[in-house]
């Protein structure tokens, strides 16, 4: 079998296709969560604590300036606001995945139905056993 046909067989297996679909859906879901966090969740929180735009929050270590030649030097800052947004996004995605996994586990790991009682064969064997114990089962022609 040639390398191309082996690759084709590998690529067309169900797990690879499922994984590819999962990656595409995950990327789209990530974009939805990003928009949810940046446009819907964080603005009211920022407004509630004093009109703060979380994406612009930063600790400035060195302010922007101009050097001796007139060239602009950008500020050196730690953008913790973006980090807060990313943490909120992560928590939303992690919770959504938790709910999906919990649902899948509930569907796939159902408890088996309780047995409905002994089968007819078991009941018949019990009757035979009890008859033999009580010596009520006699062969034909026996005294």
Swiss-Prot record:
One Gene Ontology cellular component: plasma membrane
Membrane topology of the entry: Multi-pass membrane protein
MF terms (GO), sorted A to Z: mechanosensitive monoatomic ion channel activity
UniProt superkingdom: Bacteria
This protein's record includes keyword Transmembrane helix: yes
Membrane-crossing segments per the record: 16-36, 84-104
Subcellular location, principal: membrane
Annotated localization: Cell inner membrane
Short name of any one Pfam family annotated for the protein: MscL
Keywords from the UniProt entry: Cell inner membrane, Cell membrane, Ion channel, Ion transport, Membrane, Transmembrane, Transmembrane helix, Transport
Family stated for the protein in its record: Belongs to the MscL family.
Biological role stated in the UniProt entry: Channel that opens in response to stretch forces in the membrane lipid bilayer. May participate in the regulation of osmotic pressure changes within the cell.
Assembly with partners or alone: Homopentamer.
Name of the molecule in the record: Large-conductance mechanosensitive channel
